[in-house]
């Protein structure tokens, strides 16, 4: 697409207040596209002049209709419940990920928006089983096989998005073309979700062990994911013969890497020691299961942050990686090489890193003691067999 064509475009990015949505918006703005960011919270970063931010909620159809009217493409990146304690807020996850996606599709139809690119996840296929060189021909994970509501709802949403491809727009003005990008774990300078949790664990002395049997996984640098989204939007146009319409694509940096070794440059670059202790996956999974069980009972009075959830244990401790040939062949996606060293340098330059103070490793000990005590109390409530 030429720069003059882009200058005539208006795009809306749901989830535009988040790390990826904001970065995608800035990149499109630099290419001359008129960008509107839509989110329930404002971006942490300064907005370049010319980018518009609209505060709103994907659970409101009327708000979505107002913001997407006149747009030529919507990037639906908004979601909830990817990690941490958010993963245990089941009703909110359902409302945002499923009903929010239904709303944005309906808003596009009602206001004649012809294209929608949906940001999906590996988790629509992966649920703890080993996958090597998977591709888009693999079936969705059965609904009763998910251990977390985020992955289940992202699957329901993706299925709906692809089903609504070629849906007729209002007043017979054309058709809605949709596609889905199944992204690997995102990383990059300033990433706001996963990397800060790892750094927080380092600061508290809680990153003491790894687990699993050489788990091979994939990641995607934010700039590569941005490139994939822009290419996907173009592949939904008549100029590209709508080649991406109704299609899912796996998106990553390419070759799989050991999940924990991938973060070694970050850990050591910030001055911490990389752990040498390795636990069995089953033991860590049981601990995560116990943590979730306790959270279920006491979250009304103490909505604590779990160290790990079951889905996170699977995601980080079980081998799963996918081919990106379809995205390369149909979208022209060619991931550029990036390293975690650059990311570590960014965090170091922004004040992160080991300080000249004693690491409070007893955080982990107290968390374990807390979980054990609550378990004892809960077990004491169970009826006896007598």
UniProtKB/Swiss-Prot annotation:
Residues annotated as binding NAD(+): 154
Gene Ontology biological process terms in this record: steroid biosynthetic process
Enzyme Commission number, as recorded: 1.1.1.-
Membrane-traversing stretches: 279-299, 363-383
Catalytic residue list: 150
Single Gene Ontology MF annotation: oxidoreductase activity, acting on the CH-OH group of donors, NAD or NADP as acceptor
Major location category of this protein: membrane
Record bears the keyword Cell membrane: no
One cellular-component annotation, GO: membrane
Annotated keywords: Membrane, NAD, Oxidoreductase, Transmembrane, Transmembrane helix
Membrane topology reported for the UniProt record: Multi-pass membrane protein
Coiled-coil stretches: none
Location(s) in or outside the cell: Membrane
Pfam families named among the record's database cross-references: 3Beta_HSD
Listed InterPro entries: 3Beta_OHSteriod_DH/Estase, Lipid_A_modif_metabolic_enz, NAD(P)-bd_dom_sf
Recorded family membership: Belongs to the 3-beta-HSD family.
Name of protein: Short-chain dehydrogenase/reductase family 42E member 1
